[in-house]
Amino acid sequence: EERVLDRKNGIDRRVQYAYDAAGNVLKQAILGTDGECLESSTRYDLKDRATHRTNPAGGVTRYLYDRNDRLRKEISPYGYEPESDDGAGVSYTYDSRGNRLRTTNALGEVVQELSYNLRNQPVIQKDTFGNRTELSYELDGKIKDVRRSGNHQRTLQQYEYNARGQITGVVDGNRNPISYDVDSWGRITGIGFVDGVKEGYEYTPAGQVSRTIDGNGNAVQYRYNSLGKISERIDQLGFTETFRYDEEGNLSLHIDRDGRRLQRACNVFGQPVYEKATDAEGKHTNISTWHYDSLGRVTRAVCDGKSYEYIYDAYGNLKEKRSNGKRLVSYTHDRAGQITEIMDPAGVSTRYEYDILGRRSRIYNNDGLEVRYGYDALNRISRIHYGNGVETAYTYDGDGNIRTLETKAGENVLLS
């Protein structure tokens, strides 16, 4: 059992574990003093491989392995079928040396294919759209260059190293060289760009950045406390920004370059319980406070005279947000912990649906408003379809940038 106790702020969280004979964690229960219990569990096979993980809401993630103990399939709560103890999930295939060759998502779409050299380093990466990335290596195994092959073959990155194996230069996809100066510890002391601009860095004996110099010669200085945290930052004009910390290392005071102060007190988890902001003269005070339950979840926040309350369901998800006792918004979640319904103060409900990969596929309400989302195999939005018939379609280039965007209403093109 583990216990986190902060009597001053009402936190008393206990975590209990149950183990099998092999030392594997079977159950984890997070307990609060108000009767809260968030329990998750894990099942193992005879080879001590995790086969089922169940979250507090009962959602099951299933893992299946090949005869060489490699993960061959991972099924999310959206794809898991208890009746068959199986379902649609992400599948992996390997070569005889254990290198992952192919990743296929739960819809059967090939996400990525890999090829390796004799050193088991990936030399070719290919996605479902045929975009092919090739990598070459130095004799010591460091990446030499990265190339994109296909209709427009080009080099994406080239790397140069010194005798110690430290990067001293990079040539980007536009053939712009960037040079790096390094000290005997391998720390970057200068960066030179193709236009002649150079940036510089200096360090403390402990290896922290003590001074930076931008391309215009402007310097920013940094000072640190005994714990290695920044205590002062002196900008290019000589103005000082001050930082102070409590005994746990949490920021307790921040004074900006104009003298504005922010005082803060935190609980045992580093979460703020009190903040006081003032101007340089100590006026125009703004105080905020936060209250937490025994598990460390925020239950009340007060700022500018407004009070907000937070209520959670039995599985630890945010259920309701209130202001001065009035409900602002309420939430419903599925077994995977994703929001399925949001209800506003007027009782208007907005619902959310997800596909088998856990991607948001539909948003709708009782007034007939609806939006549907489609995705490609790389989890990028490929289309957005609105209830009024308007649809926006997206295509992407080999670097993942949007190549085309077209909005249509029926056969009429509205935007392209």
Question: Can you annotate each of these PLM segments?
Answer:
Residues E1-D172, N176-F193, V197-D214, N218-D235, ...:
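Beta-strand elements of repeat-based all-beta scaffolds
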